[in-house]
Structures are given as structure tokens and as C-alpha cells.
């Protein structure tokens, strides 16, 4: 019954957050980027750099359920729902941490007192964040921070699921999901990339769960996370599109081919390299190659 009550408590906490945010959403637009995000989402136009295409696509989906006079309310409601789901995954993450502190009995079950303490910890932590000023402020307006928070919470929760199942077959599917979500998050807000160091630390902690790390080992783990973050932030994000543009210029100006043919070739070549690498690593059984 622990799992059942855990799910019920998570649902109740997220429902409280959803009702609170939907009741208090902005009726129109707040006086900053929200008006731009609402308009660009409704018309699927280009927002200010670096852009938020994933957010705009989902926000546009919500605006399709009403007329143009209620587009702002629809986008604000989308933020409210994203924030409520953030609270849901935050609760589950806190429960995961509480279970690490309160160990079950020898038969693998929790006593009533420990279960109440675990559920209470998750509920108090999640509801405290629900009604915090900064999060509530962003939860009721058409901004990217609500969806960004959801992806961050979802990624960290997925890492806890991998942590619990790391020794089981196909546990690395959670790593694949995390990689996919981190890729999507680039189209929402770059703030999500700051979750990478925490994920790297969790991965290394699992490799030596009952051991200890020296100070130098902590430094090396931190440096690994910084390198991964830097490669994505300063390498992949700016230079992949730039290189695609150079290839397109070469195809159009030098080879006389139609516009966007170079970009299409670049994307096809990039996908081919990715699939080739995937098949080779599968053949050689190198999981994290």
C-alpha cells in the first residue's frame, strides 16, 4: 500500500497546485516578455533570441482550444498546468530522498510512522514550493519558466528512477530519456542545462554507493560535469546551426543548388553519423560509448 498512498498523495499535492494556479492566472498578459510569448506562440512567429520553439509549439496547442480573444488565458493556463506537474515530480523526488534517510524494515516494508514521515516530507516540501513567491509568480503567466521548471523536475525525477533501477536490465533507458529531455529543453530555456552537474554527481554516486570519494575525486567529477555543460552550451548549440549555414552557403553559392539544400544535406549527414555510431556501439556492446 506504500506505493498506492504515495501516488494518491502526489496526485492530491499536484491537484492543489493546479487549482491554485488556475484560479489565480493572469487574465491577459503581464508587463514584460509575456505579451511577446503569447503573441509569438499564437501566430508561431519568431521570438527574441535564443528562441523558444518547443515552448511556442506547446503553447500554440493550448490556444487552439479557444478563440483569439482568449489566447492569453490559454497560454497562462498552460504555464499553470506545467507548474502543477512540476510540483508532482518535485514531490516524488523528495520522497526518493526521504526514503534514502528512512530505511525500510528487513522485510522491505515501511512502518506507519515512517510512511507518514516520508509522505509528509514530500507534501510539505512540494507545497512550500507551490506557494513560494517566485514560483507562484511564474506559474500564472505566459512565460517559459514554468515549462522550464517542469523539464528540470522531470529530468531529475528520471535520474532518481535510473538510480533505483541501475542494476536492472534496460535501466539505461532512463539515461536515454534524460538525454532526449535535455535536448528538448534547449528549445525552452538554457537554464535547464544547469541540471547536468547534478546528474553527473548522481551517476558517480551510484557507481560507488557504499564507498567514499576523496576531495580530488569530487573535483574531477565536477570538472567532468563542467566539460559536458561547456561542450553543449558553447559548442553544440551555437556551432551546429552555424556549420549548417556554411554548408548551405556552399551548396547554393558554389554548387548552384536550391536554397536549404545544404542544410538538408547537413541534417541527413548528421543523422547518418548518429545512426552509424549507434549501430556500431550496439554491435560492440558499448553502452555509454
Language-model region placement:
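Extracytoplasmic catalytic/substrate-binding loops of multi-pass membrane glycan-assembly enzymes
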Residues: 25-37, 47-59, 70-73
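Transmembrane-embedded, aromatic-rich helix segments that form part
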Residues: 151, 191-204
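Short hydrophobic alpha-helices at membrane interfaces in multi-pass membrane enzymes
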Residues: 120-123, 165-183, 213-227
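Aromatic- and kink-enriched transmembrane "portal" helix at the membrane-lumen/periplasm boundary
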Residues: 22-23, 68-76, 104-118, 122-149, ...
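Start-transfer (signal-anchor) and selected internal transmembrane alpha helices
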Residues: 1-20, 109-123, 269-289
Amino acid at each position: 500500500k506504500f506505493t498506492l498512498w504515495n501516488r494518491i498523495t502526489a496526485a492530491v499535492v499536484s491537484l492543489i497546485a493546479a487549482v491554485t494556479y488556475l484560479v489565480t492566472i493572469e487574465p491577459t498578459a503581464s508587463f514584460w516578455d509575456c505579451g511577446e510569448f503569447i503573441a509569438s506562440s499564437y501566430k508561431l512567429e519568431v521570438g527574441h533570441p535564443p528562441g523558444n520553439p518547443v515552448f511556442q509549439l506547446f503553447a500554440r496547442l493550448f490556444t487552439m482550444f479557444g478563440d483569439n480573444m482568449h489566447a492569453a488565458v490559454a497560454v497562462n493556463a498552460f504555464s499553470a498546468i506545467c507548474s502543477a506537474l512540476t510540483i508532482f515530480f518535485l514531490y516524488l523526488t523528495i520522497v526518493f530522498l526521504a526514503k534514502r534517510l528512512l530505511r525500510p524494515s528487513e522485510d522491505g516494508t515501511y512502518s506507519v510512522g515512517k510512511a507518514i514521515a516520508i509522505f509528509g516530507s514530500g507534501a510539505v516540501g512540494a507545497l512550500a514550493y507551490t506557494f513560494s513567491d517566485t514560483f507562484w509568480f511564474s506559474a500564472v503567466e505566459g512565460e517559459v519558466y514554468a515549462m522550464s521548471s517542469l523539464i528540470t523536475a522531470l529530468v531529475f525525477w528520471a535520474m532518481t528512477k535510473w538510480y533505483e533501477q541501475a542494476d536492472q536490465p534496460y535501466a539505461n533507458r532512463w539515461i536515454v530519456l534524460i538525454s532526449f529531455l535535455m535536448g528538448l529543453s534547449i528549445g525552452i530555456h538554457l537554464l535547464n542545462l544547469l541540471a547536468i552537474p547534478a546528474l553527473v554527481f548522481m551517476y558517480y554516486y551510484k557507481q560507488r554507493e557504499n564507498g567514499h570519494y576523496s576531495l580530488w575525486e569530487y573535483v574531477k567529477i565536477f570538472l567532468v560535469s563542467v566539460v559536458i555543460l561547456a561542450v553543449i552550451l558553447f559548442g553544440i548549440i551555437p556551432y551546429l546551426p552555424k556549420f549548417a549555414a556554411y554548408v548551405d552557403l556552399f551548396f547554393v553559392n558554389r554548387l548552384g543548388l536550391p536554397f536549404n539544400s545544404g542544410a538538408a544535406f547537413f541534417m541527413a549527414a548528421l543523422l547518418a553519423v548518429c545512426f552509424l555510431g549507434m549501430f556500431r556501439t550496439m554491435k560492440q556492446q558499448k553502452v555509454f560509448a
